[in-house]
């Protein structure tokens, strides 16, 4: 079994954020980390502008910006959970990431810290301290006497090993790897590394102090009696030992958790019930309501104000009132609500970035005056979607169109939500008219002051690329049919048919639009070009084709017109003085023209086009002509026998592209060099199986491409990389941007039998819709298809003790519910409140033997009272749907198990009590299998002759496990995922019992399992690895048949809670076999797919992966092979039978020369590799 792992959605949870001057001396940057990648933003007057992101081969544990003497830019220090570290810089002239130093901080002896890895940097940039192992402090001395010239000169001397990163995910990255173990001190940043002993074993936090001549650290630690204290240490000049520091403080409070350095000197000791300032001489304190502070940031350079965020999502400010560097008093005030923060970064002018791993990250502004309506100083400026942590998810084909969507339980506590995630872009319909046979649609704006469609528009290839380029309001929509043209007038939301006096209405229109600077409308038909006064709608000029000829194709750009008549290419211009139509040039081509485009590359610029591009029949070529002479400057054979059907010139992120589509669903992409008038970087990809028509459209001040075909697709650019997102529409024949008073920022969409006005989703690879859970956290979710609803287990955390810190031992109360939501509207239908101390752990729809009609809902719970622990299985029926928005009115009375079965409410039918928690429920062949701690129970719901009613019963059917967390089934087999004993395979016997037939003997802590097929099974384990095991059916040895052999392993690098069979893509009609795929979602908010591939594909991609590792070097010198190697507490082994699809996909973005190097040992061309990658990717993501 061979597997291809590809990320559909990269991590979204923010773990760290820092600010500084990283990309340039005058740049203000925000840098955030999301588990395995960093994102760099530029702060300007318009807000945060994304610059680029970089993948890191490791889970980021420390992210710090620092400066050294003589450097105008800051450096970035990164440390990973696997003890790798690096120091990065940015060359703002070359626009490249540079690795200044890197190394491995792992020690052969030592116990990793229980409190997590800590990394701190001296405020003066002299030294880095890493606390990775108990009792040890690793010191990395920084050379703080270098000038920028010294850094650059040294870097140039190592130029052969320093081929650095561009903006596109580690493309062509080579880094200097300074091997710490070999004491390589050539780095101008890092001088040496030493381990020093630290007396304190249970370190909770540490920080460098400001204003110290010698680097000095403060350490918050816990002793054997759980008392907490602070020690300070000076680092000796030789960096080989710690010297007792200037002060210490005992018994700082059992709830102390954070140390915050203060530029005035000293530290803030942050506890759950207060904040204290200490500097060895002065102590100042302020009490706060009981909470748990999670993140902080300094506001002022002198440290007189700090912002704090807590686990309730409250933002507060601490003010240090001081006189002459002496802190006199602390004042604390709550400012407002934010997402539960993992990081806080103060940007400028009251603007603050809130990074969150619990909910959406935010950009907020702090106001000087409180908003009395919200009782808050906070204004929300922008939200950044985060779907992590994904606790559970289900895969549903809600629209029965063959394309699934994921519905996740995302976020924690008050940031909890359901997220509906689907591949592609949706259209929200606003109005629809039944109109059959529409051949073209053209918006006309309200007046001649602005123009919505001033650039190229073609007929048969329908490149109405400029529709909606400006922001003027559209008043009319011209609709063209085979034998007539109609004008639709829009007054608000009212639509009616009208007429223009000068418009030819008794024939089909190839193009209609406005020439704003000439106050004209232009209409082009098969026989004429008509100019119409845009005020009076009277015709002012006309050009007619010869009676024996017909216009086939047309494209325009303001007063420029090109059209084709058979083999002839004609170029016209509109005379601005007398508003006449002038033929400038006509040439005859060797073959008929199949597509044409005259649009300027930058559609926002009101400039004349210098080029016209065409596609030809017969010789299947793309040709480019210079205007106004129509001199041919480039000829590009496309190959094959399929005609080019549409052509388009466009600029994305200042890169000029020419797209040419074919009649079989393929698309050619070229880059164009204006200086040499040459095409280069030819790529061919597949968008569908039917002819593709390319159209430009505008959305939020960006121009994108709508590719009309059997799989409509939007082509857009992000960070100079092109993306292709499927649009969830069928039977589309034409589209254009449309922006009227009644339908602002919309799209007009023609199908085979209707005209629709709608708004388009935000353009991105995945569309994510948020359903808030009203400050509840979703824990488990299932879809009940028979009842058209979702069942969700939620948890609500009630904020207790807000009035003070007097009862610190009391826990925040958690209440668990079962919520039922309509699967279309997500309205709350019904609710059931679980008992006190009871938590829902598992939920599943089920059917029982002898009852094929009813679908029941089963819920497994855990009850943890102060006295004992136990669990229940609850069996519900669900009546017909109704909706209500009042959750309290829907909650059951828990003292009455026979709560009402009225419409839309859950009815509790039966319950079974167990002595332990019920961690998982599985519907299995007409019964319910319950995982109750170490045992499996079979639950049946049958009719009792004695009681003359249905009764529930259970029996133990298997034992011998440690703790069963997950189950999966296929036919008569059950796969068991044990917390400590890996995976085992059970088979159903004729008497209903379960017998173990094989197990994996490795000590692997399983988190989730799935059955790939009858013989291969996959598990996600606690150290962020995948493992694939195989059933030994063919072995003649009985002992071997009882083992599940490990045949595949791979480090995914993220914690996986759930795996489900399914796919996010709508597969095109094809004779190719369907590729089995399993979707997974992570705690960090990523979504990925594991696809089973053939041995032939595996061999090919293994060789390509090896070639890419020679070309694509990891940032910081981190190794891809090391990163993907299976690793847990017991051993580390190389990845086996897995392909890193993310690395493979980087091939698509490499320059051609790098692609040649990557495929050098494969004996194929880059184009062959490109097509093979695209062929696989379209089936799995």
UniProtKB/Swiss-Prot annotation:
Subcellular location: Cytoplasm; Nucleus
Entry keyword set: Cytoplasm, DNA damage, DNA repair, DNA-binding, Nucleus
Main location: cytoplasm
Gene3D superfamilies: 1.10.150.910, YVTN repeat-like/Quinoprotein amine dehydrogenase (2.130.10.10)
GO cellular component, one term: site of double-strand break
Region ranges (Disordered): 150-187, 449-468, 882-902
InterPro entries: Beta-prop_RSE1/DDB1/CPSF1_1st, Cleavage/polyA-sp_fac_asu_C, Quinoprotein_ADH-like_sf, RSE1/DDB1/CFT1/CPSF1, WD40/YVTN_repeat-like_dom_sf, WD40_repeat_dom_sf
Gene Ontology biological process terms in this record: DNA damage response; DNA repair; proteasome-mediated ubiquitin-dependent protein catabolic process; protein ubiquitination
Induction cue: Down-regulated in response to UV-damage followed by an increase in transcription back to basal level. Shows slight increase in transcription following cisplatin treatment.
Residue ranges, compositional bias (Low complexity): 449-465, 891-900
Family statement drawn from the similarity comment of this UniProt entry: Belongs to the DDB1 family.
Function: Plays a role in DNA repair. May be a component of an E3 ubiquitin-protein ligase which promotes histone ubiquitination in response to UV irradiation. Histone ubiquitination may be important for subsequent DNA repair.
PANTHER family, A to Z: DNA REPAIR/RNA PROCESSING CPSF FAMILY
Name used for this protein in its record: DNA damage-binding protein 1
Organism: Dictyostelium discoideum
Lineage of the species this protein comes from: Eukaryota, Amoebozoa, Evosea, Eumycetozoa, Dictyostelia
Name of the coding gene: repE
